């Protein structure tokens, strides 16, 4: 999945070992899995060349997507186009 982080979310992620995000719509910090129990445990992370993006490798305690899919990236472009026809 792709999510947003602010400094607080990054700090909480690094200090707890669980993936936290900043919700742009709710304007608040959230712990991934807080409601579903599908927590994301940090295994390692990398920072990009500009130090403005991070990539986390996680162990997932369940599906990541709110649809119940293991990943949010489960649809192909063709499926998306055909579903709108």
Swiss-Prot record:
Textual note on the cofactor: Binds 1 Mg(2+) ion per subunit. Binds 1 zinc ion per subunit.
Documented EC number(s): 3.5.4.19
Keyword check for Metal-binding: yes
Binding-site positions, Zn(2+): 49, 65, 72
UniProt cross-references to InterPro entries, sorted A to Z: PRib_AMP_CycHydrolase_dom (IPR002496), PRib_AMP_CycHydrolase_sf (IPR038019)
Main enzyme class: hydrolase
GO cellular component, one term: cytoplasm
Protein keywords: Amino-acid biosynthesis, Cytoplasm, Histidine biosynthesis, Hydrolase, Magnesium, Metal-binding, Zinc
GO molecular function: metal ion binding; phosphoribosyl-AMP cyclohydrolase activity
GO biological process, one term: L-histidine biosynthetic process
Binding site for Mg(2+): 48, 50, 52
Cofactor: Mg(2+); Zn(2+)
Main location (coarse class): cytoplasm
Family matches, as Pfam families: PRA-CH
Biological or metabolic pathway of the protein: Amino-acid biosynthesis; L-histidine biosynthesis; L-histidine from 5-phospho-alpha-D-ribose 1-diphosphate: step 3/9
Amino-acid biosynthesis is among the record's keywords: yes
Cellular localization per UniProt: Cytoplasm
Catalytic reactions of this protein: 1-(5-phospho-beta-D-ribosyl)-5'-AMP + H2O = 1-(5-phospho-beta-D-ribosyl)-5-[(5-phospho-beta-D-ribosylamino)methylideneamino]imidazole-4-carboxamide
Stated role: Catalyzes the hydrolysis of the adenine ring of phosphoribosyl-AMP.
Assembly behavior: Homodimer.
Family: Belongs to the PRA-CH family.
Official protein name in the record: Phosphoribosyl-AMP cyclohydrolase
Organism: Saccharolobus solfataricus (strain ATCC 35092 / DSM 1617 / JCM 11322 / P2) (Sulfolobus solfataricus)
Organism taxonomic ancestry: Archaea, Thermoproteota, Thermoprotei, Sulfolobales, Sulfolobaceae
